[in-house]
Amino acid sequence: DFASVFVAAEEGYFKKRNLEVELKFIPLNSTIPAALQSDSLQIGGPTPSVFLQAVDGGLDLVLVAGGGLTSKTITGFGLVARAGSGIKNPQDCVGKKIGVPGLGAFLHVTFRAWLKDSGVDHRKVNFVEASFPQHADLLRGGSVDAVVSADPFMSRITESGAGYVASYYSTFLPENNQTIVHAAKREWVAKNPGAARAFRESLVEAAAFMQQPKNDAKVRAAIGK
């Protein structure tokens, strides 16, 4: 989702446009609008559902740039079940406690849509909010039966044996839906139109860089940092 941001930083696209960018990791996507509102962030990457909920709730946020897109070929996020849980399909999630990195955020909303499409009432699943770094420990400790997670956290969980991928449910989602958007306060964009434009242009250049197969190793290295 944020690969273009990492690449733009690593390849110097921000610096080329005289942007000083400090990347901050926000464990729960649902807290990004509040961080923008308090000026802890100038630009943040909420999921579309989190952004819309924030605007509907009265926050004066605007979009600066797009982000990642869904694809049936992407297996970078999915349902990761605790070892020994027996979860194999949507029906097995009924009555289970499942951690999601932000209630109402993209992974939570799309997972519920997948359950619905599979004939499962999401209200029969107990969802709890859990940040990505917590996922492995929550599975090991048995606090949750599964998590809706994403790489690199998902890969670390499976490699450690704490859990297994029960479904790459993202492969069932429609193509080319936004997974995250880059947003800012309207006031900040009005005062800094050049910076907002330079940020967007940097991501466009990074996206073009990522589309070239010869750059795959550099892209993976940038994301890994």
Regions found by a protein language model. Give the residues of each.
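Short, glycine-/small- and polar/acidic-enriched structural segments
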Residues: 1-131, 138, 145-152, 162, ...
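Pocket-lining segment of extracytoplasmic ligand-binding domains
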Residues: 133-224
